[in-house]
Amino acid sequence: MNKYLLDTHVLLWMQDDNIALSKAARKILEDSTTQLYLSIASLWEITIKQSLGKLQLQYSLEELIDSCNANKINILPIDFETLKILKTLPFIHRDPFDRIIIATSMELDLDLISSDEIAKKYSTSVIW
């Protein structure tokens, strides 16, 4: 079974059925045999951006979490192993949420689904 970690924007684009999703990403997301994961950092990022007025959604955070559950997207905590990897990451990427997501991908050996070009500079598999 293939296992993938979703970047924050991928979750939102999936929720909105956004045409910005690549064909490769869409194929993975539509495959019922894949196992999808999301870092709690993504929900934290969404919450902060909403509270700052930088992100407006047509649905609540609760509805987004319900959608994750309905789509069998497993929400992962930030644990000590993730923090150990995060501490050693070079500062190629300055966004703290993306750094946590990248560290989670590395820790759990999950392919990261993301359009983020900077994420590709780390030693984790990025699919787009």
Region locations from a protein language model:
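Short, well-structured N-terminal submotif of metal-dependent ribonuclease cores
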Residues: 1-38, 54-66, 108, 117-121
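Generic structural signal for small/hydrophobic residues in well-ordered secondary structure
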Residues: 8-9, 46, 86, 105
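Alpha-helix capping/helix-boundary segments
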Residues: 10, 42, 82, 101, ...
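Acidic catalytic patch
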Residues: 63-91
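Acidic donor-binding loop at a coil-to-helix junction in glycosyltransferase catalytic cores
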Residues: 97
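Acidic, PIN/NYN-like endoribonuclease modules and their adjacent C-terminal/linker elements
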Residues: 100-128
